[in-house]
């Protein structure tokens, strides 16, 4: 066989194989490679979105944490203020109660002083009558001289 004919036959077979490969084998391979490249690109994009979402979530979590701490501090402050107001109210109530008890005790003491004075006046009047009776050596009628005794009580 002739070398030229062999070479031409091999060229023809090569071109047929190349044409067959380009028509039937090459498109599915290119589609598979394109799909794989697209999946890789989508995966990288999803990873980037995940990173940005994570950063946003961390910022939001930090903001929520700061907000919660601020709210906690505000509640503690409000509780302390309320505690102080309750203490002040209790002190005020106790002072009012002490003043009321003191006023009642003072009124009771004044009433007892008045009763003791009246009793003392009666005793002084009785002693004065007895003293006058002994001085005069005669009996003095207390009912007759009631006005005089009342006048003496008033002077005492």
UniProtKB/Swiss-Prot annotation:
CDD domains: ATP-synt_Fo_b (cd06503). The keyword Ion transport applies. One of its GO terms (cellular component) is proton-transporting ATP synthase complex. The chain crosses the membrane at residues 7-27. GO terms for molecular function: proton-transporting ATP synthase activity, rotational mechanism; proton-transporting ATPase activity, rotational mechanism. It is a single-pass membrane protein. SUPFAM superfamilies: F1F0 ATP synthase subunit B, membrane domain. It is found in: Cell inner membrane. F(1)F(0) ATP synthase produces ATP from ADP in the presence of a proton or sodium gradient. F-type ATPases consist of two structural domains, F(1) containing the extramembraneous catalytic core and F(0) containing the membrane proton channel, linked together by a central stalk and a peripheral stalk. During catalysis, ATP synthesis in the catalytic domain of F(1) is coupled via a rotary mechanism of the central stalk subunits to proton translocation. F-type ATPases have 2 components, F(1) - the catalytic core - and F(0) - the membrane proton channel. F(1) has five subunits: alpha(3), beta(3), gamma(1), delta(1), epsilon(1). F(0) has three main subunits: a(1), b(2) and c(10-14). The alpha and beta chains form an alternating ring which encloses part of the gamma chain. F(1) is attached to F(0) by a central stalk formed by the gamma and epsilon chains, while a peripheral stalk is formed by the delta and b chains. Belongs to the ATPase B chain family. This is ATP synthase subunit b. The lineage of its organism: Bacteria, Pseudomonadati, Pseudomonadota, Betaproteobacteria, Burkholderiales.
